[in-house]
Amino acid sequence: MIACHIFQEGVAIEIAEAVVGALKGELAATAVNAPMVPAEVLSELAPYVVLAERLGRLAVQLVAGGSGMKSAKVVYKSARDPDDLDTRLLRAMITKGIIEPISDSFINLVNADFTAKKKGLRISEERVVVDASPELPVFSIQVQLSNVDSKFGSAVSGGGDISIEGKVKNGIPHLTQVGSFSVDVSLEGNLILCRQVDQPGMIGQVGNILGEQNVNVSFMSVGRTARRRNAIMAIGVDEEPNLESLKKIGEVPAIEEFVFLKL
């Protein structure tokens, strides 16, 4: 929670500076290559910037050898007409989230797109109209990474891309889709994703392993394709589990694969 609040404060400061600049008729972040976004759009999209950055950060950590990425696609689902949805700020934050974990440079709204191009990463966007409240600028954001291997096979969609999706709920970013599995976990702290056989006792087993090492579980969600078949367990943890804990999780017979993700 503390880390998320610190990040949100940093984003808030950056947005506030951009809003002040926009009110003066300046570009966002007062730089030529930063997203030029009107103040009213900045204000409306503020709750979504953390979601956008977190989804990008999660997606790149699912790649086996993240520096090999060449193509990413962002899908914005909204009740609004695509021409009425300004996504430049969200695109910049997603790009920042993808690039920062695999870059030695400091990444911000100004240099994110430039750094992505230097690394040969092409980012495309699609706006999809859905039946949702038009008062919300964005219903959900989906990030897809193409032509890469995944550390977590269950994050791969039917089309062969790494695919994750999220929403803002009550002002908090949530992960709602991993590959073809539906989940619902707050994107705060760190995250463990496990693919398992859907059977009783799995939550308790993993929780006990983490508890033995004094790792606090902040939330947990299970999504499955069918009863008693494969399921995805998403576990939020406040601390980073040590190697011993992660090894024990991998040794649970019903767990077929898992991945630890830093937020």
Feature-to-residue mapping (PLM):
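NAD(P)-dependent dehydrogenase/reductase Rossmann-like domain
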Residues: 2-263
